[in-house]
Regions:
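Short inter-helical turns and helix N-cap capping residues of alpha-solenoid HEAT/ARM repeat scaffolds
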Residues: 46-47, 77-82, 112-113, 143-144
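Ankyrin-repeat helical core positions
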Residues: 43-44, 59, 75, 94, ...
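Conserved hydrophobic register position within alpha-solenoid helical repeats
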Residues: 54, 86-89, 120, 151
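Amphipathic alpha-helical scaffolding segments comprising HEAT/armadillo-like alpha-solenoid repeats
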Residues: 2-3, 31-42, 63-77, 98-110, ...
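Core register positions within helices of long alpha-helical scaffolds
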Residues: 23-26, 57, 92, 123-126, ...
């Protein structure tokens, strides 16, 4: 079965809806958006697999414009504790080559979940600069032994 969603509020709608019954947005008005813009909007989709897929594709595109929307989505996700989505966002940020993602990834080394800290470390390992190396060294003092070990492996590589 195929489900259709309003591209504004992500409420489920009927296939032939012209206006969203919930938010009153005109559905056709979103047709002009670029693929990139639609992916960014999908980071807020009500269905978690769509959010994860959007983060993954944004990472694969390696478009630096995605850093801010990904970071914003990560901040929103932190409140609902969707570790799989958060991890997908961290991995996507690591695939985007550019200094824009670096501060976000460094901040994630203080995330409460060792899974997210590990994903941030792996993403930071792609950056070959002083800031990233200093952040990875800081992870040697992480409370999680697995994070400490990962940091050692990255620094030895």
């Amino acid at each position: 079965m195929i489900f259709f969603y309003c591209p504004n509020c992500w409420s489920r709608i009927e296939e032939d809806e012209k206006v969203c019954p919930k938010c009153k947005a005109e559905i056709k008005a979103f047709d002009h958006l670029s693929y990139f813009e639609k992916l960014v909007r999908a980071l807020n989709h009500s269905e978690r697999t769509t959010r994860i897929r959007a983060a993954y594709i944004l990472g694969e595109l390696k478009d630096k414009r995605a850093v801010k929307p990904l970071a914003k989505a990560l901040n929103k996700a932190h409140g609902i504790r969707d570790m799989f989505f958060e991890e997908a966002v961290v991995i996507a940020l690591g695939k985007i080559d550019g200094e824009e993602a670096l501060p976000v990834l460094i901040d994630l080394l203080d995330h409460p979940s060792f899974l997210i800290r590990g994903a941030a470390l792996n993403s930071l390992s792609r950056f070959k600069n002083k800031k990233a190396t200093q952040a990875i060294k800081k992870a040697l003092d992480d409370p999680s032994l697995s994070i400490q070990e990962l940091a050692r492996k990255i620094l030895q590589a």
